[in-house]
Amino acid sequence: MKKVIIIDASVSPSGSYTHLLLERFLATFQAKNKDVELSTWNLNELPVGQISYNTQNAGTFFSVENSDKYIDALKAAHGVIILAPMTNFNYPATLKNFIDHVFVANKTFKDKYVTKGASSGMLGNLKVVVLGSQGAPLGWYPWGDHVNSLRGLFGFAGVASFASVIIDGTKLLYKDKSKSEVVDMFAKQVDAIANEF
């Protein structure tokens, strides 16, 4: 049985571009993969998405409950689908908090300062798909490429299979279309990635 984890970092409870992309993705993926165990981690509701790393909690931040449990689940999973709309030119703060909890030396990557040689990732088992959106067209803010940043982070952790769909320019390009109509424009791209997942 394939274990697939949905990491929901969208601040919208439902009906957002990323949620609609997820619906399309799952419809295609599950049509070909009947034996799948889906888990959803809503980072708006879980402590792992709410607790940020700071001086007050530095000694207890990387706990079994908020780090190891999630790291073990990632290592046991076939794939991860991340809902990541752009927020202030980056992925949401809840996703940053999650990444801080699970990107741990010698658990998700071998730290070059601990072991001889360069760092190497320990999440090579994972396939990662990011479903993103942003108000501005791609390239308007090169320093704010949140999906490419996630590609780099997961690559560092050993993920070789990374794909993404990003609906960009939502504030400019699609004023006269419903969100569903916009998502339909990306259907072929979503389906192609879902079929390879």
Curated annotation (Swiss-Prot):
Residues bound to FMN:
S10
What are the protein's UniProt keywords?
A: Flavoprotein, FMN, NAD, Oxidoreductase
Q: Report which reactions are catalysed by this protein.
A: 2 a quinone + NADH + H(+) = 2 a 1,4-benzosemiquinone + NAD(+); N,N-dimethyl-1,4-phenylenediamine + anthranilate + 2 NAD(+) = 2-(4-dimethylaminophenyl)diazenylbenzoate + 2 NADH + 2 H(+)
| Flavoprotein recorded as keyword | yes
Q: Which InterPro entries match?
A: Flavodoxin_fold (IPR003680), Flavoprotein-like_sf (IPR029039), FMN-dep_NADH:Q_OxRdtase_AzoR1 (IPR050104), NADH:quinone_OxRdtase_FMN_depd (IPR023048)
Pfam families, per this entry? Flavodoxin_2
Out of the domains of life, which is the source?
Answer: Bacteria
Q: GO MF annotations for this entry?
A: electron transfer activity; FMN binding; oxidoreductase activity, acting on NAD(P)H as acceptor; oxidoreductase activity, acting on NAD(P)H, quinone or similar compound as acceptor
Cofactor binding, per record: Binds 1 FMN per subunit.
Q: How does it assemble?
A: Homodimer.
Annotated NCBIfam families: PRK01355.1
Record-stated family? Belongs to the azoreductase type 1 family.
Q: What is this protein called?
A: FMN-dependent NADH:quinone oxidoreductase
Q: Which gene encodes it?
A: azoR
